[in-house]
Each structure stands twice: as structure tokens, then as C-alpha cells.
Amino acid sequence: MVIDPELGIDIVNLGLVYKVNVDDEGVCTVDMTLTSMGCPMGPQIIDQVKTVLAEIPEIQDTEVNIVWSPPWTKDMMSRYAKIALGVS
């Protein structure tokens, strides 16, 4: 699980992960976004994603693509994340 260090919620519940694919060679491609283009924790979050996925034996390599479309909004958060952060 990768926790956003600024918000304290995992990136899946925050709605930051858009797509995950693993090909036949075990290469995992993750399309994800950040809460803002200037997010100072972006490189740290990407490193954490790669570290967590490297623990899965079937994953041989990981590519993390930061995408800005669609733009992230609080509406993408799970109910859990909204409650935890006090967002309605």
C-alpha cells in the first residue's frame, strides 16, 4: 500500500491510480496522477509504487506514468478517503 505522505491516505482510495496493466513478461505499467502538477511528493510516491510492486514475485519491472488527463478532483476519492479527510 502506498500512502500519500501529505494526506495520509493510500493512493488507490485517493483515486490517483487510473490504470494498472501487467504484460506477459511481467512488466507492470501504472497510469496515475497526483493531486496537483506541482506536488513535491511526486518522486517519492513513484518510488514507493515501484518498491511495493517489486515485492510481487510475478512483477519483473514497473513503469509508472504520471498523467494529467483526466484531471484529478476530490470526486475521484473513495467514500473512505472522503470521510477520513472530512470532504463532502
Curated annotation (Swiss-Prot):
It comes from the Bacteria. Induction: Transcription of sufT decreases when aerobically cultured cells are shifted to an anaerobic (fermentative) environment, and increases upon reaeration. Up-regulated upon culture in serine dropout medium relative to liquid 20 AA medium. InterPro entries: Fe-S_Maturation_MIP18 (IPR052339), FSCA_dom_sf (IPR034904), MIP18-like (IPR002744). Disruption phenotype: Cells lacking this gene have decreased activities of the Fe-S cluster-dependent enzymes AcnA, LeuCD and IlvD, meaning a defect in the assembly of Fe-S proteins. They are capable of growth in liquid chemically defined medium containing the 20 canonical amino acids (AA) and glucose as a carbon source, but display growth defects in defined medium lacking leucine and isoleucine. Involved in the maturation of iron-sulfur (Fe-S) proteins. May function as a Fe-S cluster carrier. Is required for S.aureus growth under conditions that impose a high demand for lipoic acid, likely via a role in the maturation of the lipoate synthase LipA. Is non-essential for growth in conditions that impose a low demand for lipoic acid or Fe-S clusters, such as fermentative growth. Also seems to be involved in the maturation of AcnA, LeuCD and IlvD proteins, that utilize Fe-S cluster cofactors, and its role increases under conditions of high-demand for Fe-S clusters (respiratory growth). Belongs to the MIP18 family. This is Fe-S protein maturation auxiliary factor SufT. It comes from Staphylococcus aureus (strain USA300). The lineage of its organism: Bacteria, Bacillati, Bacillota, Bacilli, Bacillales.
